[in-house]
Design a protein with these regions (language model features):
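Alpha-helical scaffolding within the catalytic cores
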Residues: 68-72, 298
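Glycine-rich, proline-tolerant flexible connector loops at the mouths of alpha/beta enzymes
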Residues: 88-102
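Active-site mouth loops of central-metabolism enzymes
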Residues: 54-67, 145-147
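Active-site region of glycoside hydrolase catalytic domains
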Residues: 1-53, 77, 96-98, 107-501
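Short, well-structured secondary-structure segments
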Residues: 82-89, 123-127
Length: 502
């Protein structure tokens, strides 16, 4: 029977904008994320062109990996990490995005990080652009809407590829690139918000601008991949998709067709371009219906053909249902992708519906479509952790969530899926990208940092730390119920109470 491969890449995932902090240290510039205020589940964060005195911008300090990287990497090694997903902050290398020469202090920082990972034989998995678009490029070009950004991106890519060619093997070009197919992608992913001041949920939606920006990201990704294939054959280049698995709300053929349409636009379009090297025919009708006309230059199609990915990665947190019935109003509150609540699934406190079986289904669908090695590079449960007086976090609800998803990954491997690794999101507590809060915690490691900006940043191991340590030690077999830490009856009760019906 097929099991997780012996060289399976167990680890954890982070992003510089949510974790690194030190936003203006050693010559770093401001990114789009640095211009986002704090928020909550009920009050959306805002983006401001100018920094407001007295307003908290949580990404500026985050949980301070910049000054704690040795301690944090030691914790990752203690758990047994084989891979460490992180991003390079573009603005630490090119502060405004438009400099001719890179910032040496920024490059030296990542040298130190990669050397520290190598000390523990941990493989870095580096996202080149993970919501760290220089704000200078927003002001100059309206973010990725400006084709000029491609050249600035490639200058950045050329520098980091050359600098870290002997230290990094696995690269991802853009984080959750398909978020640009949805209005929410305008802020962090595309940066098409020049002059906007207000809640991130109220940015005026302009599909023409979003999809033109996506076209420029496709070109930038393909150029980076071709450069890697031609000059650095040791590199393995991947994409990263936000996979929002969708089911028909009913077996009504109208619902099935609506689900197919949404799956194509949200989940398949971007990866079809990045994996196959061309625009799929189904997108033509969508563009016609929306009045979208992509401005292409001669040679664009060839660039896309020559820059396809080596492996496919994605985030998986939830699923949702789609319906063609306008009378159905049961929306999934808090669900990043909207859509209709699935009555068969429970949800987290943030309304994200929990669907472990959906991960197995998703892995099979992606594998059947592309026949490329796959990696789940984000997955996890955002929760309000309680710190006991003796410094413990009994997060049995997180263990329950993760063990069920790992079990379904194992089933997908038995189905024949080529799965190369797993990096749960926010293995150490980081700032939430969607809400800008610290209260929504994912980590195996608790960081004493709070929504009012206070906290001494000390790191504490949660119960899930020891559980995941055992999962890695046993190459996934330790994920089954009864393995890892023992749970008390009160902890089981806590886990049951955590979930609610969506």
């Amino acid at each position: 029977m097929r099991t997780f491969r012996e060289d399976f890449l167990w680890g954890g995932a982070t992003a510089a904008n949510q974790y690194e902090g030190a936003w203006d240290t050693d010559g770093k510039g401001a990114s789009v994320s640095d211009h986002c205020t704090n928020g909550s589940h009920t009050c959306p964060k805002r983006v401001t062109p100018e920094f407001e005195e007295g307003t908290l911008y949580p990404s500026r300090d985050a949980t301070d990996f910049y000054h704690h990287y040795k301690e944090d990497i030691a914790l990752a090694a203690e758990m047994g990490f084989k891979v460490f997903r992180m991003s390079i902050n573009w603005t630490r290398i090119f502060p405004t995005g438009m400099e001719e020469e890179p910032n040496e202090a920024g490059l030296a920082f990542y040298d130190r990080v990669f050397d520290e990972l190598a000390k523990y034989s941990i493989e870095p998995l580096v996202t080149i652009s993970h919501y760290e678009l220089p704000y200078g490029l927003v002001e100059a070009y309206n973010g990725w809407y400006g084709r000029e950004v491609i050249d600035h991106f490639m200058r950045y890519v050329e520098v980091i590829f050359d600098r870290y060619q002997d230290k990094v093997k696995y690269w991802l070009t853009f984080n959750e690139i398909n978020s640009g197919t949805m209005p929410m992608g305008a802020v962090l992913s595309l940066g098409t918000i020049r002059g906007y001041n207000g809640p991130v949920t109220e940015v005026p939606d302009e599909p023409q601008i979003r999809f033109q920006g996506l076209h420029h990201q496709f070109l930038a990704s393909a150029k980076a991949i071709r450069l890697a294939h031609e000059k650095y054959p040791q590199f393995k280049m991947g994409n990263m998709n936000l996979f929002a698995t969708k089911y028909p709300y009913t077996c009504n053929p109208a619902d099935v067709l609506e689900c197919q349409k949404q799956m194509r636009i949200v989940n398949w379009f971007c990866s079809d371009v990045q994996a196959r090297g061309y625009y799929p025919t189904y997108i033509e009708r969508y563009f016609d219906e929306k009045g979208i006309k992509i401005a292409k230059e001669p040679g664009d199609d060839e660039i896309l053909r020559n820059g396809t990915i080596d492996f496919y990665t994605f985030s998986y947190y939830m699923s949702a249902c789609e319906t063609a019935d306008p009378e159905v109003t049961a929306k999934s509150g808090g669900n990043l992708v909207g859509a209709v609540t699935n009555p068969y699934l429970k949800a987290s406190d943030w309304g994200w519906q929990i669907d472990p079986e959906g991960l197995r289904y998703t892995l099979n669908e992606i594998w059947d479509r592309y026949q490329l090695p796959l990696m789940v590079v984000e997955n996890g449960l955002g929760a309000r952790d309680e710190l006991t007086e003796d410094g413990k976090v009994h997060d049995s609800y997180r263990i329950d969530y993760l063990e069920k998803h790992i079990a379904q990954m194992a089933e997908a491997v038995r189905d024949g899926v080529d799965l190369m690794g797993y990096t749960p999101w926010g293995w150490i507590d980081v700032v939430s990208a969607s809400t800008g809060e610290m209260a929504k915690r994912y980590g195996f490691v608790y960081v004493k940092k709070y929504d009012d900006g206070t906290g001494d940043l000390s790191r504490l191991r949660k119960d899930s730390f020891y559980w995941y340590q055992n999962v890695i030690r046993e190459n996934g077999t330790g994920a089954s119920r009864g393995q890892g830490i023992c749970r008390s009856r009160s902890e089981d009760h806590q886990r049951r109470r955590f979930y609610r019906r969506g």
